Amino acid sequence: MSKQTFTTTFAGKPLVVEVGQVAKRANGATVVRYGESTVLTAAVMSKKMSTGDFFPLQVNYEEKMYAAGKFPGGWMKREGRPSTDATLTARLIDRPIRPMFAEGFRNEVQVINTVLSYDEDASAPMAAMLGSSLALSISDIPFNGPIAGVQVAYVEGEFIINPDKAQQEASLLELTVAGTKDAINMVESGAKELPEAIMLEALLVGHKAIQELIAFQEEIVAAVGKEKAEVELLQVAADLQAEIIETYNADLQQAIQVEEKKAREAATEAVKERVIAAYEERYAADEEHDRIMRDVAEILEQMEHAEVRRLITEDKVRPDGRRVDEIRPLAAEIDFLPRVHGSGLFTRGQTQALSVLTLAPMGDTQIIDGLEPEYKKRFLHHYNFPQYSVGETGRYGAAGRREIGHGALGERALAQVLPSLEAFPYAIRLVAEVLESNGSSSQASICAGTLALMAAGVPIKAPVAGIAMGLISDGTNYTVLTDIQGLEDHFGDMDFKVAGTRQGITALQMDIKIEGITPQILEEALAQAKKARFEILDLIEATIAEPRPELAPTAPKIDTIKIDVDKIKVVIGKGGETIDKIIAETGVKIDIDEEGNVSIYSSDQDAINRAKEIIASLVREAKVGEVYHAKVVRIEKFGAFVNLFDKTDALVHISEIAWSRTTNVSDVLEIGEEVDVKVIKVDDKGRIDASMKALVPRPPKPEKSEAKKEGKHD
């Protein structure tokens, strides 16, 4: 196929899609040019079905530093593992695409997005999402798209689609929404305490823009799309399914209705083991043994799935016996740990998170050097999910995509209420340790984070709480669930996380397993989440009503002084010599910004005071009219040089030593002598003139007759 180009304008920027020129061996490939951002997307499918019990979809978002005209850092000088932003963008694209493949599809699919040029005013992630949908849609991969995504900002009461950098910085909302022509299927958002009505309107505005992008894609697919390949779907033998359901469904239903999680899991597992043992014995010698046992496991999964959903939609009974809008039992505690700067323990049912806060000087902020201009990140929220939290063994190591994503969600939720840098000049790190998990652990980490912040004395604007909402839908009827647990998340259709204060929403995240949800469901879920959020905030505020007025004794204290910008080099010294000496002498940490704000950190207030004195003396300037007790350091024929303070000297001209005539300076002054002087002039080069005689009254002039007599006598 020769190169074909499709052009439109979207959100005020040119949008160009090119097909047929590059990556022609992939099943589908596109080059998307949006503004001056360029993204190459290639989609590839394996020829055989995998044997796993899940759909092996991999989406990558690769940031090439050359795209922004930057040289990679580090001694290797080449791109390494994906940045946090790249990982989050890959997840952002994966989530709306994954529901668009058929149930039972098991062929491995890889979608690789490579950023070739980067324009910070034209969203490369949204270009990559469009490219991913298009590469799959025009390929022979059986993808039930297209989908599209947009970013939405809210500036001065107006919604803006795919805002530029300046608009993003002014916005009260940072929303990414994706979906199909008919419905929304993915949401990721941070917001500055916006009400539910505005959030819902933003989602609908975003979906309208999505429909425009999908219409554009449909034109391209009609022109260059390939016929979809026939692939084998994972299906079970109908007669085997009927037999197992008839024999064991009643036992499985009874096990699923056990309310306590561990007991329910044990009862359910016992039924499954009995079924598997029976069929292992029957088909041990059968040449189709592996396929049959795979079918047995899949049938049991389907039976459990169907029963959980039936209980909720028909009987309005949840696995643990709660009402559809009921939260599990709550508990909150602060100061769980000694020595640390702040800690909070939050428990909701069988989900528990411990959040630990650390404060540090601004010099410890994280430096982000990606495609955007380098910047410093003051607030970090890290989320850890050890396998023991679900009673299992498993991999331990660096944080995976899920942990990075959950940490970022908590970070967005809590960042909206942090004090300004001017009011609280600290770097802040929160670490959420999930100690026990039965669903909604990311939201428990947000609640625990609020407790830790307030216990540490961080003056947040308001406490934040989070709740996870679920959905069970059969296409006609639906049930929205409050505070979903693991089983409801696994077998449900939606995981909709909502975090916020009493004032409004600070973060949203939605993933669904069906092709989309309606505005009515969104509105109902937001209203139900608000009620639950307020209930959790009641508990948090009962535990700690407001941030403590003082920091923990172990936290670094801080004092800030302002110096003239041209004095920064004086404090730092040649090669950092002066500031290093101050740090070594006092034991403090010192940060100086480009505006001359000097922040001094230490757990010892006396050390801070000593460092302040040293810095103040370094940047001190002599001012006209001020009087100093100075020391003579050099004598010349024309006057004496005196040291006013530190390394600041002034000249006392011979004419300024006394009111009477001075013939020799050395007759009046000697080196090391201490004298009082008054500054009378500072020139534009910083040279200082001082006077001794200005500090004594001028003697009266002699009368003329006396002067004549004295003259004749002389």
From Swiss-Prot:
Enzyme nomenclature, EC number: 2.7.7.8
SUPFAM superfamilies assigned: Eukaryotic type KH-domain (KH-domain type I) (SSF54791), Nucleic acid-binding proteins (SSF50249), Polynucleotide phosphorylase/guanosine pentaphosphate synthase (PNPase/GPSI), domain 3 (SSF46915), Ribonuclease PH domain 2-like (SSF55666), Ribosomal protein S5 domain 2-like (SSF54211)
Binding site for Mg(2+): 489, 495
GO cellular component term, pick one: cytosol
Biased composition (Basic and acidic residues): 700-714
Biological process according to GO: mRNA catabolic process; RNA processing
The protein's name: Polyribonucleotide nucleotidyltransferase
Species per Swiss-Prot/TrEMBL record: Streptococcus equi subsp. equi (strain 4047)
Upper lineage: Bacteria, Bacillati, Bacillota, Bacilli, Lactobacillales
Gene: pnp
